[in-house]
Every structure is written in C-alpha cells, then in structure tokens.
Amino acid sequence: MIRAFFVTDLHGSISRYEKLFAAIRDEKPSVLFLGGDLLAHRLRPVLWGTGVITNFVSEYLQVRLKALRDLLKEAYPAIYVIMGNDDARSEETYFIDTDRQGLWSYIHEREVEYGGYTIYGYAYVPPTPFQIKDWERYDVSRYVDPGAIPPTEGFRTVESSDDVSQATIARDLDRLVRPGSLKHAVFLFHSPPYQTSLDRAALDGVTFDGVPLDVHVGSIAIKRFIEERQPYLTMHGHIHESSRIT
C-alpha cells in the first residue's frame, strides 16, 4: 500500500512547513503531493532563523528538502508539485531547478509514472478577483463571474506564450490527457471542481453591483472532466475555507 501525504496552500508559512517536515520524518510517507500556493506573498517578508528570506524556494525549501533527504536517505518520499494562482510564475525557474536537483518533480501540464499510477499536474484556476493572472484561465468560455477580473486584464510576472483571450481550462485538459481509461490516473489540481464541497467560498450575502455572487467558485471544466473521465483520484486546493464551511 502506498502511504501518501497531500498538502496545499501553505503560502510560505514556515511554521506549517516545519510541521509538514516533522510529519514526514515521523511517518515516512512514500509520496508527497504539494498542490500549489506554496510561496509567501510577494510583498511579505519571511523570517527564518536570524535573517529574512528573499527567495523562498532556493533559500528555504531547497535547504530543508536537502536536509530531509540526507536524513531519510532511501525513505525520502517522491514529491510531486504544482504552483497555484498566488505563486508568481516568475518563480517557476526555481521550481524547475529544484526538480533538476532531484528534490521534487514539478509536474504542471505533465504526466509521470509512479507505483503503477499515472500522475498529472495542472495549476490553472478560473478567473478570480485578484490582480495576478499568471495561473488563471477562462474556464469553459469567456464568461467571467461578477467581480472577477478576466485573464486578459490584471498583471503577469511572466509574459504568457499562449493566446490568453482564447485559452480555456477545458481545452487544456483535452490536450493534456489522452483518450482512454483513467482508472489508474491521479490528478493534482489547484482548482477544485465547481459546485462541490471543495469550492465553497465564504460569499454568502455578498453582492457586486447589486448582483449576488456565486458561493461556488471552482472550475466547471474540471468538474465535467472528472464526471466524464472518472480518474482514480483527484486532489484540489485553492479555497481555504471550504473544509470549514462544508
């Protein structure tokens, strides 16, 4: 039996990461999935030891993961990682560098094999009210919920190579996943599926220009994909309060 940990939305919290590393040392999972929104906010300094961290991946995560690998040796888990909508894509080069060092596998829009399963990673979320758009896509069409900012607006830390006015989560999933059975497929998403217990936001009674906001903010495309293709397992992050509300 594969012993797995799934953790998401740590947002650069040193205390939460240290709890995670302690749990890995104690319980020795075979595999760890990190579901995005892993970095500290760009404008918030992170203190560690006696100094301030200026690059969270290279100065903290790589250091702690190397120490963990040295300690656990053969018991060091396989680690699969995606970024999230609050992670600046300008930091992606450091995620790739950590992959090259063998500390984790960065799997956004990739498929990898592990223990008889095919693992897929996908970081994009539907449009949000937030300004950073590195990891946002139109969902199934160019419709945007009231109060949300389209992916064509806001700002990006890295120029997109896609036509963001036409790209959708639905098209991405069609391209990423080949036809056929997904009974041994595992998906690491940042976005939750729409209208489920995982995408319930604390928006009760909130309006925008007099229009009540939908309390469900997940992806229609991801929900349809799960219902139609029936993968073995999907993991999701993004909406912090959903577990408390539901």
Give residue spans per PLM region.
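Active-site-proximal loop/helix segment associated with metal-binding centers of metalloenzymes
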Residues: Y117-D214
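A structural motif corresponding to the C-terminal end of an alpha-helix
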Residues: K66-I79, L103, L176-H184, R224-Y232
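Active-site environment of divalent metal-dependent phosphoester hydrolases
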Residues: H11-S15, L39-L43, V81-T93, E113, ...
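Beta-strand-turn-beta hairpins that frame and shape the catalytic cleft
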Residues: M1-F5, E111-G121, L182-A185, T246
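Active-site-proximal segments of metal-dependent phosphoesterases and phosphodiesterases across multiple
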Residues: L39, G49-L61, K183-Q230
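Short, Asp-centered acidic motifs that coordinate Mg2+ and/or phosphate
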Residues: A4, V31, H184-V186, Y232-L233
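Core catalytic region of metal-dependent phosphoesterases/phosphodiesterases
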Residues: I14-Y114
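Acidic/histidine-rich helix-loop elements
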Residues: T8, L39-Y60, P129-P146, T207-D209
